[in-house]
């Protein structure tokens, strides 16, 4: 009983010590999204609720339907920067959209050019006056803190988020690219503290997939909704640096943390909640490809689990099999044996396909020819 209680206490401790909040960025709330949200419902959720689209001067909101129980969570509204050029219309659009929601907590996500920060601050101030009793927050990038006008923007809202992730898209495969620049992040955190304002930091759980043409020139960037199946030779990955993220959390224990975005079962390009639990403690998880053996009578089922990593390519793994199972018949699943493999025999090594972080992939079934005594 002591052991069980001790283990339960550890699990409870790590569950309680997860982040201060999660962004939910899915446009379709399928069952997997609801299940993921339910698992972290005790924490603060920042849910994408609507995106403003402007086409040929026509303004239209693309709204996202979410379960009733989450409609009082913080609503995130995405707005294109071009909307700032028509402040009166934008304020009216935002006012009507906000007052149609059941929450009093609103966050604006706008990729504001530095040259428009002063303009943005004026819009926020006017909107704040029209929405007494509402909690308004915004997201800012490190580049915004280089501008004096950022202080005015910050003063116009209740609090703000420093987004510490993003990527400068390369023009060629040979160029360097990363999800978080160490120098930029360190400078931004230092400047954010000098604002003497309430802010939180947003750290990435996701990876970008970059696609390149045969000549190496950049083709396309994927952040979600990409399967990654098939030929991956023209792809590269910009993944979270676990060591760097853990160091940020250790060095800034007084700053609330938000994760972007909430891992969902069908989201191939995010870290697992197991990984994020460790990171939230300032612990750097060790990447590994973990083998699991499960015996069911005369059958041995072998699977692998990608731990604490977002794999783009498959990996060669040596099968660890108990000696008494070496004489069995083998059927490969979701895996490829290396050259020289004879069907039905047990290969020494296999190629494990890439999969979602933390997901267990069946790779082989071994059956004994004679009943196991």
PLM feature spans:
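Chitinase-like catalytic core of GlcNAc-active glycosidases
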Residues: 22-27, 36-40, 48-162
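Generic structural signal for well-ordered alpha-helices
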Residues: 33-37, 61-65, 91-98, 121-128, ...
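Conserved, mostly hydrophobic/aromatic
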Residues: 45, 108, 160, 201, ...
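Low-complexity, acidic Ser/Thr/Pro/Gly-rich terminal tails and inter-domain linkers that flank the onset
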Residues: 274-296, 325
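Substrate-binding surface in catalytic domains of secreted glycosidases
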Residues: 118-224
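Intrinsically disordered, low-complexity Pro/Gly/Ser/Thr-rich segments with frequent PxxP/GP/PP motifs
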Residues: 327-364
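Asparagine-centered strand-capping/turn motif at beta-strand->loop junctions
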Residues: 300-313, 321
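Substrate-binding cleft of secreted/luminal carbohydrate-active enzymes
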Residues: 202, 206-208, 214-281
């Amino acid at each position: 009983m002591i052991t069980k209680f001790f283990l339960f206490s550890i699990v409870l401790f790590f569950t309680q010590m997860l982040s201060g909040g999660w962004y939910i960025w899915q446009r379709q709330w399928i069952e997997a999204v609801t299940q993921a949200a339910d698992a972290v419902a005790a924490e603060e959720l920042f849910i994408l609720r609507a995106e403003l689209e402007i086409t040929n001067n026509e303004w239209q909101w693309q709204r996202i339907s979410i379960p009733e129980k989450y409609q009082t969570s913080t609503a995130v509204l995405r707005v294109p920067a071009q909307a700032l050029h028509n402040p009166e219309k934008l304020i009216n659009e935002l006012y009507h959209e906000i007052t149609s929601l059941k929450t009093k907590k609103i966050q604006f996500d706008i990729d504001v050019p530095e040259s428009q920060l002063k303009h943005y601050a004026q819009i926020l101030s006017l909107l704040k006056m029209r929405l007494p009793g509402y909690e308004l927050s915004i997201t800012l990038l490190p580049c915004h803190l280089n501008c004096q006008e950022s202080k005015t923007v910050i003063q116009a809202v209740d609090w703000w988020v420093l987004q510490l992730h993003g990527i400068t898209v390369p023009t060629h495969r040979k160029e360097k690219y990363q999800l978080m620049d160490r120098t930029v992040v360190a400078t931004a955190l230092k400047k954010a503290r000098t604002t003497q304002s309430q802010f939180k930091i947003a750290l990435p759980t996701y990876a970008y997939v970059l696609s390149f043409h045969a000549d190496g020139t950049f083709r396309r960037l994927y952040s979600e909704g990409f399967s990654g199946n098939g030929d991956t030779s023209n792809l590269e990955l910009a993944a979270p640096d676990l060591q760097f993220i853990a160091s940020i959390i250790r060095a800034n224990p007084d700053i609330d943390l938000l994760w972007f975005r909430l891992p969902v079962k069908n989201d191939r390009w995010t870290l697992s909640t197991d990984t994020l639990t460790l990171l939230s403690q300032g612990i750097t998880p060790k990447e590994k490809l973990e083998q699991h053996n499960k015996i069911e009578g005369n059958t041995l089922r072998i699977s692998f689990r990608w731990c604490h990593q977002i794999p783009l390519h498959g990996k060669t793994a040596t099968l660890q099999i108990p000696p008494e199972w070496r004489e069995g018949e083998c059927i490969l699943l979701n895996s490829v044996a290396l050259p020289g493999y004879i069907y039905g025999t047990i290969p020494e090594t296999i190629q494990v396909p890439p999969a979602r972080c933390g997901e267990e992939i069946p790779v082989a079934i071994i059956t004994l020819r004679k009943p196991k005594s």
